[in-house]
UniProtKB/Swiss-Prot annotation:
PROSITE patterns the record matches: GLUTAREDOXIN_2
Disulfide bonds: C46-C49
Name of the protein described by the UniProt record: Glutaredoxin-C3
Function: Has a glutathione-disulfide oxidoreductase activity in the presence of NADPH and glutathione reductase. Reduces low molecular weight disulfides and proteins.
Location(s) in or outside the cell: Cytoplasm; Nucleus
UniProt xrefs under Pfam families: Glutaredoxin
Main location: cytoplasm
Record-linked Gene3D superfamilies: Glutaredoxin
Domain of life per record: Eukaryota
Annotated source species: Oryza sativa subsp. japonica (Rice)
Similarity-based family: Belongs to the glutaredoxin family. CC-type subfamily.
InterPro entries linked: GlrX-like_pln_2 (IPR011905), Glutaredoxin (IPR002109), Thioredoxin-like_sf (IPR036249)
Motif residue range(s): Responsive for interaction with TGA factors: 132-135
Length: 135
């Protein structure tokens, strides 16, 4: 009988751990966007990105900034952001994707939407609602 017990143990193999899933670019954007009150997807050499970051800092808001050119998966994220923002045309015809801003985990949009919200007065309430601005 010992032989039978040893044989059973020899053939027992625990189930292998499932292979980790690679997070899709859109899922990663959504996850990163939900981790902070204000999230800016940017390119470090982009003047429009710099302007939107300065706008927030000037208001006393310190956004979490994800520099796509410094991220190994930055190109994938940029394509995902283009889909989310609605830029679907050919690369030569489409406007620059960055900066893309999320406030309270919700997509605000690119620079044009952020500046429009700032000018019409709707940006401050969004920031307060997200907990990024207290005054």
């Amino acid at each position: 009988m010992q032989y039978g017990a040893a044989a059973e143990q020899a053939w027992y193999m625990p189930a292998a751990a499932p292979a980790p899933m690679v997070e899709s670019a859109v899922a990663r954007v959504e996850r990163l966007a939900s981790e902070s009150a204000v999230v800016v997807f940017s390119v470090s050499s982009c003047c429009m990105c710099h302007a939107v970051k300065r706008l927030f800092c000037g208001m006393g808001v310190h956004p979490t900034v994800h520099e796509l050119d410094l991220d190994p998966r930055g190109r994938e994220l940029e394509r995902a952001l283009a889909r989310l923002v609605g830029y679907g045309g050919p690369a030569a015809a489409s406007p620059p994707v960055v900066p893309v801003v999320f406030i309270g985990g919700k997509l605000v949009g690119a620079m044009d939407r952020v500046m429009a919200a700032h000018i019409n007065g709707s940006l401050v309430p969004l920031l307060k609602e997200a907990g990024a601005l207290w005054l």
